[in-house]
C-alpha cells in the first residue's frame, strides 16, 4: 500500500527520512505563518510537533490561514491544527497547548513544551505576532542555545514602534 512517505523516501533516502521522523519541532503560533509552517512540517515527515496558540479561528483568518474555513470558525486553532496534522501525517505526534505566549510566561511555557517533547527539541519556530515576545524568545534561544527559526511578521502592525 502506498503511503505519504513513499515520495519522501525516494527524494531523501531512508537515513534523512528517519532523521525527519525523529525530529521534534516546537511552533509558537498557529496563525498565518504558523499554520502554513506546521502543515509543511507535517507533510515533510516531521515526527513530533508541539504547537502553542491561544486564539480561535475567526472569519477574517480565512483569507490567509491554512486552518481557517467556514467549518472551523470559532474553534481553537491548536485543536484544528492538531486534527489537520493527524489527517495529513497520522504518525506525527502532536502536543497542543492552548496558551497565549507572552514574554512573561515564555520560560515556563517553553519548559512545559520541552518536557512534553521528551526533554529535547530540535527547532523552535517563532510565528508570534508581538515584538516583545519575539525579542524574549530570541533572548531565550541565545541563553539556552537552541535553534530558532523566526518569522518577522507582526500581524496588523504597520508601524511597530
For the regions a protein language model found, what residue spans apply to each?
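Hydrophobic/small residue at the entry helix of a nucleotide-binding pocket
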Residues: 33
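E1/E1-like adenylate-forming module used to activate ubiquitin-like modifiers
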Residues: 123-161
